[in-house]
UniProtKB/Swiss-Prot annotation:
Protein name per its UniProtKB record: Photosystem I P700 chlorophyll a apoprotein A1
An MF annotation (GO) of this entry: electron transfer activity
Enzyme class: oxidoreductase
Binding-site residues for chlorophyll a, renumbered to this chain: 684, 692
Any single GO CC term annotated in Swiss-Prot or TrEMBL for this entry: chloroplast thylakoid membrane
Keywords: 4Fe-4S, Chlorophyll, Chloroplast, Chromophore, Electron transport, Iron, Iron-sulfur, Magnesium, Membrane, Metal-binding, Oxidoreductase, Photosynthesis, Photosystem I, Plastid, Thylakoid, Transmembrane, Transmembrane helix, Transport
Family: Belongs to the PsaA/PsaB family.
Species assigned in the record: Ostreococcus tauri
EC number: 1.97.1.12
Localization (cell): Plastid, Chloroplast thylakoid membrane
GO BP term, pick one: photosynthesis
Binding annotation for phylloquinone: 693
Recorded catalytic activity of this chain's protein: reduced [plastocyanin] + hnu + oxidized [2Fe-2S]-[ferredoxin] = oxidized [plastocyanin] + reduced [2Fe-2S]-[ferredoxin]
Membrane-topology annotation of the record: Multi-pass membrane protein
Length: 751
C-alpha cells in the first residue's frame, strides 16, 4: 500500500499572483514610444507622432506574452474606473456648489435644472439664462437632478459628501491599478478561471449590487420621495440615517415596517406589498415609474443573480463547467458546434471584447428606448430637453459600441484565430459559407434600399405634381404598420390577463390615458401610421447596410478571393499593390472605417425620427380645451416625403439654433456653426489624394531649405490610413456636435 506523504494531504492555497513582477519607475514616462523598438529611437519623420498614437494602447504589439497583456488590460480598467469616479465627483460637486438643486427640488415643474454659471469675461454671462426661482445659469439636460431626487438626495451637503466619497473611490481605483500590475499581479490562470469569474460577477456585482440598491431604494429613497411627493419641504424631511434607525418613522409611511422581519420568516410576504408593489404605469405626481415598483424589480433581479452566481463549478465538485456546456452545444447544422469556442474566449481578449461590446451596444440602444417609454426618474418625462439628450446619447453610445464589436472581432480573426483548432465547428462553418451570408445580406440591402427610398421618391413626385390622392399617407393610400399596432394593442390589454391587480401596463405608450404633470404631457399612447411605416423601413435599410459592411470586414479579415493571404498583411493595410481590379481599402480596418459612416447614417435617422415624432405626437400640454402638441401632429402629414423631412423638420426646427445669437442659447448657435466647420474639414481628409499633399510638402520643404530653416524632422503627408482615421474622427465629431446643438437649442426654446 502507498502512504501519501503528509504534505500532500494539507490543502495548499493556490497562489494566483506574482509578487513585485514589474518595478515601479517613472523613467518610461519620459521616453515616448518606449513600448516599441522602432518608435523608441525617436522621430525621423512626422509620421512618428501618428504611429505613437496608433500603437500606444495596442498591447498586443508591445509583447506576445498573454499574461503580461492581460495584466496591462486589467490594470488599465482600474485607471478607467478612477477617471469615471473623478468625472462623477465633478458632476456631484457642480450640483453642490454651482446649482439650483434645492430650489428645483421644491418646484420641479416650473424651475429648470442648472448646475453651471458662466463667468463674465467678455460678455459670456449672456449664457446664464433665467431658469426660474431667481437663478441665472446654463440649463442642463443630463438628468442628474432627476436621478438625485429619485435616489433621495435632499440637500447640497449630501451632494458634497458624495463628491468627496467619489474622489476617495477614484484614489482607491488608481492605487488598485498600480498594485495589481506592480505589486501583486494576477497570473494568467486567474484571468482564465471563467467559472469563478462568472460566479463573482453574477453574485457579487449584479446580485449584491442590485440588492444593495434595492436596500437603498427601500430604506432611504422611498420615504424621502413619498414625503417630497406629498409636498413636504425638503428641509423638513428627516435625514437618511433617521429612517434607518427609527422604525416608527418608516411605519408612518409604510405600516408593514412595524412588523419587522416576522412576515419574511413566516412566508407571509404579501404583508410587504405596501413598499414592494406591482402597479405598472407611471406615478401621476412625478411622471416617473413607481419607486415601489422599481424597488421590487431590483429585489427580484438581486435574487435571480444571487442564484445565478452559484451555477458554476469551482472548488466544490458541483455546478456547471463552461467548457462542457459549450462542447455539448451541437445543433443539426453546426457540425462540431461550439467546440473550440472555450479556448478562443479564454485566450483571445479581442474575441471576448467583441461579444461584450455587441451586447453592451445593444443594451445601450434598449436603454435609450426605455428612458422615454418607461421614464425611471421623477420629473424626467416632462423635461423634454433631458429626454431628447438621454435618447440621443444612448443611441450614439450603442452605435459606437457595435462598430467596436466588429473592429475587435476582426482583430481577433487576424491575430488570434487558429484554423487548426476550429475545424468544422460553428465558427468554421460560418466562415466557409461567408459568400452566401454576404451575398444574401447584400440582396437584402438592395431590396430594402430601393423599396424604402422608392416610397419616398414616389410621394415627393406625386406631391410635386399636385396629386395628393396618389400618395402613400394616412389620408390617401394607407400603409399602416399593422403588426406594430397589434403589438401595442396586445401590450396595452395584457395586464388584464397577466397582472389583474396592476393599475397600468408597462408603458403609457402602448395605449390608455395621457399622463400629464402640471399640465405638461409626460407620456401618452403613441399612434403609428404610414409615415412611421416608411421611416421604419429606412431604419431597417441603414442598419442592414451597417451590418453588411461590418460583417464582411470580420468574415473576410483573414482571406478573400482577391487577397488570399490577407491575414499576413495584418488588421490595417492600405493596399496590396496594383492590379487585380484594385486592392486598396480592403483591410478589416477599412471595413470598420466605412461601417462608422453607415452607423452615423443609421443613428442620425433614428434620433431625427424620435425628435420629430415626440414633438408632433407626444410632447405638449393638456388644457381645458384639449391636447396641444409642440408641432401639432405634423409628423403624419409631412414625414412621408423627403421634402417634408427637409422643410418641416430640418429647416423649420433649425430656426431656433440659427437665430440664437444674442440670447442665452447663443453658445448652441456657435457650436452649430463650428461643428459644421469641423464636419466640412473632415471632407478634406476623406476626398484626398495622398500624393498631392506629399508633393505640396516637398515644395514647402524646398522653400524652407532655401531659407536655411528646414526642420530636422522630415515632414511627411499622412498615410492613407491615417488620413482616413483623421477624416472619420472629424466627420463623426462634427456631425454629432451639429446634431446636438440643433436639438438642444430647439427643444430648450420650445419645450
Amino acid at each position: 500500500m502507498t502512504i501519501s506523504p503528509p504534505e500532500r494531504e494539507i490543502k495548499t492555497v493556490k497562489i494566483v499572483v506574482d509578487r513585485d513582477p514589474v518595478p515601479t519607475s517613472f523613467e518610461k514616462w519620459a521616453k515616448p514610444g518606449h513600448f516599441s523598438r522602432t518608435l523608441a529611437k525617436g522621430p525621423a519623420t512626422t509620421t512618428w507622432v501618428w504611429d505613437l498614437h496608433a500603437d500606444a494602447h495596442d498591447f498586443d504589439s508591445h509583447t506576445t506574452d498573454l499574461e503580461d497583456i492581460s495584466r496591462k488590460v486589467f490594470s488599465a480598467h482600474f485607471g478607467q474606473l478612477g477617471v469615471i469616479f473623478i468625472w462623477l465627483s465633478g458632476m456631484y460637486f457642480h450640483g453642490a456648489r454651482f446649482s439650483n438643486y434645492e430650489a428645483w427640488l421644491s418646484d420641479p415643474t416650473h424651475i429648470k435644472p442648472s448646475a453651471q454659471v458662466v463667468w463674465p469675461i467678455v460678455g459670456q454671462e449672456i449664457l446664464n439664462g433665467d431658469v426660474g426661482g431667481g437663478f441665472q445659469g446654463v440649463q442642463i439636460t443630463s438628468g442628474f437632478f432627476q436621478l438625485w431626487r429619485g435616489s433621495g438626495i435632499t440637500s447640497e451637503l449630501q451632494l458634497y459628501s458624495t463628491a468627496i466619497g467619489a474622489l476617495i473611490c477614484a484614489g482607491l481605483m488608481f492605487f488598485a491599478g498600480w498594485w495589481h500590475y506592480h505589486k501583486a499581479a494576477p497570473k494568467l490562470e486567474w484571468f482564465q478561471n471563467v467559472e469563478s469569474m462568472m460566479n463573482h460577477h453574477l453574485a457579487g456585482l449584479l446580485g449584491l449590487g442590485s440588492l444593495a440598491w434595492a436596500g437603498h431604494q427601500i430604506h432611504i429613497a422611498l420615504p424621502v420621495n413619498t414625503l417630497l411627493d406629498a409636498g413636504v419641504d425638503p428641509k423638513e424631511i428627516p435625514l437618511p440615517h433617521e429612517f434607518m434607525l427609527n422604525r416608527a418613522l418608516m411605519a408612518e409611511l409604510y405600516p408593514s415596517f412595524a412588523k419587522g422581519l416576522t412576515p419574511f420568516f413566516t412566508f407571509n410576504w404579501t404583508e410587504y406589498s405596501d413598499f414592494l408593489t406591482f402597479r405598472g404605469g407611471l406615478n401621476p405626481v412625478t411622471g416617473g415609474l413607481w419607486l415601489t415598483d422599481m424597488a421590487h424589480h431590483h429585489l427580484a433581479i438581486a435574487v435571480l443573480f444571487l442564484v445565478a452566481g452559484h451555477q458554476y463549478r469551482t472548488n466544490w465538485g458541483i455546478g456547471h463547467s463552461m467548457k462542457e456546456i459549450l462542447e455539448a452545444h451541437k445543433g443539426p447544422f453546426t457540425g462540431e458546434g461550439h467546440k473550440g469556442l472555450y479556448e478562443i474566449l479564454t485566450t483571445s481578449w479581442h474575441a471576448q471584447l467583441a461579444i461584450n461590446l455587441a451586447l453592451m451596444g445593444s443594451l445601450s440602444i434598449i436603454v435609450s428606448h426605455h428612458m422615454y417609454s418607461m421614464p425611471p426618474y421623477p420629473y424626467l418625462a416632462t423635461d423634454y430637453g433631458t429626454q431628447l439628450s438621454l435618447f440621443t446619447h444612448h443611441m450614439w453610445i450603442g452605435g459606437f459600441c457595435i462598430c467596436g464589436a466588429a473592429a475587435h472581432a476582426a482583430i481577433f480573426m487576424v491575430r488570434d484565430y487558429d484554423p487548426a483548432t476550429n475545424y468544422n465547428n460553428v465558427l468554421d462553418r460560418v466562415l466557409r459559407h461567408r459568400d452566401a451570408i454576404i451575398s444574401h445580406l447584400n440582396w437584402v440591402c438592395i431590396f430594402l434600399g430601393f423599396h424604402s427610398f422608392g416610397l419616398y421618391i414616389h410621394n415627393d413626385t406625386m406631391s410635386a405634381l399636385g396629386r395628393p390622392q396618389d400618395m402613400f399617407s394616412d389620408t390617401a393610400i394607407q400603409l399602416q404598420p399593422i403588426f406594430a399596432q397589434f403589438v401595442q394593442h396586445t401590450h396595452a390589454l395584457a395586464p388584464e390577463l397577466t397582472a389583474p391587480t396592476a393599475a397600468g401596463s408597462t408603458s403609457a405608450s402602448w395605449g390608455g390615458d395621457i399622463v400629464a404633470v402640471g399640465g405638461k404631457i409626460a407620456m401618452m399612447p403613441i399612434s403609428l401610421g404610414t409615415s412611421d411605416f416608411m421611416v421604419h423601413h429606412i431604419h431597417a435599410f441603414t442598419i442592414h447596410v451597417t451590418v453588411l459592411i461590418l460583417l464582411k470586414g470580420v468574415l473576410f479579415a483573414r482571406s478573400s478571393r482577391l487577397i488570399p493571404d490577407k491575414a499576413n498583411l495584418g488588421f490595417r493595410f492600405p493596399c496590396d499593390g496594383p492590379g487585380r481590379g484594385g486592392t486598396c481599402q480592403v483591410s478589416a480596418w477599412d471595413h470598420v472605417f466605412l461601417g462608422l459612416f453607415w452607423m452615423y447614417n443609421s443613428i442620425s435617422i433614428v434620433i431625427f425620427h424620435f425628435s420629430w415624432k415626440m414633438q408632433s405626437d407626444v410632447w405638449g400640454s393638456v388644457t381645458g380645451n384639449g391636447v396641444s402638441h409642440i408641432t401639432g401632429g405634423n409628423f403624419a402629414q409631412s414625414a412621408n416625403t423627403i421634402n417634408g423631412w427637409l422643410r418641416d423638420f430640418l429647416w423649420a426646427q433649425s430656426s431656433q439654433v440659427i437665430q440664437s445669437y444674442g440670447s442665452a442659447l447663443s453658445a448652441y448657435g456657435l457650436i452649430f456653426l463650428g461643428a459644421h466647420f469641423i464636419w466640412a474639414f473632415s471632407l478634406m481628409f476623406l476626398f484626398s489624394g495622398r500624393g498631392y499633399w506629399q508633393e505640396l510638402i516637398e515644395s514647402i520643404v524646398w522653400a524652407h531649405n532655401k531659407l536655411k530653416v528646414a526642420p530636422a524632422i522630415q515632414p511627411r503627408a499622412l498615410s492613407i490610413t491615417q488620413g482616413r482615421a483623421v477624416g472619420v474622427a472629424h466627420y463623426l465629431l462634427g456631425g454629432i456636435a451639429t446634431t446636438w446643438s440643433f436639438f438642444l437649442a430647439r427643444i430648450i426654446a420650445v419645450g
